[in-house]
């Protein structure tokens, strides 16, 4: 494992990395990562999914001090940073520190002796970021997959460790560690049982932070199962937070998985967490065989198959199948579409394709409990596309941490000690720890350029471009000119009608939406009486005439939103006047000056009397406020406000004076021909100034 070593897929790296860890007798755990799905969604790229991570960091799980649990343990400085290089289309090791410092490690010496003193396993490499080796071809990169280079100072261990039981001394050590765990973390809980043969049968534990997490998010519970080479079983209990990120709330280790042990494990979980009756849904792996016991322990909860685990199962079955590469590629696309752009058609398509790679019993089981489970997919879809990506990525991170640590330990004792030492480490936000790269300038994809879309009905998309080195810091005007020049000629006049007939604010708001459309990949599909428009976000329904949309922007402002603009962009149509609410159109707006005053103040008689002048100002202010109120509504709400205003005017005018709502007095200018732009002409005698005061 050297700096600059390249790997075609993440599985290739994982194979070499596992061999490296076995050879050097060290354990690493995933710390930070940015998944390919997360990167593709946020940057509009199409990186291969077998890359899995565009950037991932692994750190040594061991500490520099003894195993006594402290709040801030000194971690071993060894780590590895793996990155994806787009030009090579390869993963490569960009940073590597192989200096291990383990305060309690027993490393075999070349002579075969062991020592309890602190040892350092060092490689003849310097820690420095590097770029992958580039040559005319990738022979060297491919060769590194077959013949990886390891450190010179190695410790030879058996690739298949012998099964080890828990001795009485080990039990005493575990009891001591758990006692210290409960003492240091106030509010933590632990329980273990010993069988007749004086072997550990079960261990359950959770920290105080885990308890708090379950109290806050008890509705959805997920069981993740891991089995190591010795046959021991680990169950991780996970919940979803409000961002739909997975968090571990409980661990349970079983020597053997039986009806009795699983029932006891679930019972201990309910004893530790008094809010267990609030659990509404429990998600399980398709291989979980104790659904009846789970239903008995959680009688009010629904037991559903986990979308995450079933998806990973289908991916594994597809990878191991003998299907041709083209079918595998199509099924991967179908699986991705079913999970992230869920629809009845996409699920039906995936179900049909899965029949070719699954045995009959498994296919029938998934067809009955996964493909056709309406509740499962309803819960999944209602949280939106972005939440689905966050959910899958966070589960990737957490399950990778749990599985790698549990499977890599040489003994169950070491595994338990490591899990207790780093119990709260599994809930770190690795997905968001890495810095976000600066955004690149984007441009709309020309209509003639083909689109690499995930959906067959994709119409248009985006491509990312970077400026030359000498133009990395253009001023705002240069950027604006460049972006405008990249708009296709057929779309230049798209907003002209809105710019000419609408207000400046309406044009600005709508133009912002148009910029989003230009810089996005949008999917347009017919959906009965409406058109589904999606910009890599929650889909919304747009009327066929383009006058309404279900998104919050259009509902609030009554302006063409990004979804309407995407529909117009697809059909090569401009924004029409009917798509803009009257309150944004110039001919309906009250003509006010820059400071809110009436444009033509000369038409208001200046009598020189402060009382009457003050009343004129009050009438103008009232007219302006009423105009604003009425311009903010349309349809039934406008009629209701208009009716209320007429009643107020009738009451104000008094029984002896009929309402003059539709009369146009000469003292005030009706610029919009609307019934609310009016003013009552003052007579010579006039009313006392006090009668002009209107309380509201």
Swiss-Prot record:
Signal peptide start and end residues: none
Domain of life (superkingdom): Eukaryota
Disulphide bond pairs: none
GO molecular function, one term: zinc ion binding
PROSITE patterns, alphabetized: ZF_SWIM
UniProt keyword terms in alphabetical order: Metal-binding, Zinc, Zinc-finger
InterPro entries: Zinc_finger_SWIM, Znf_PMZ, Znf_SWIM, ZSWIM1-3_helical, ZSWIM1-3_RNaseH-like, ZSWIM1/3_C, ZSWIM3_N
Keyword Ion transport carried by entry: no
Zinc finger (SWIM-type): 531-572
PANTHER family in alphabetical order: SWIM-TYPE DOMAIN-CONTAINING PROTEIN (PTHR31569), ZINC FINGER SWIM DOMAIN-CONTAINING PROTEIN 3 (PTHR31569:SF3)
Protein name stated in the entry: Zinc finger SWIM domain-containing protein 3
Phylogenetic placement of the source organism: Eukaryota, Metazoa, Chordata, Craniata, Vertebrata
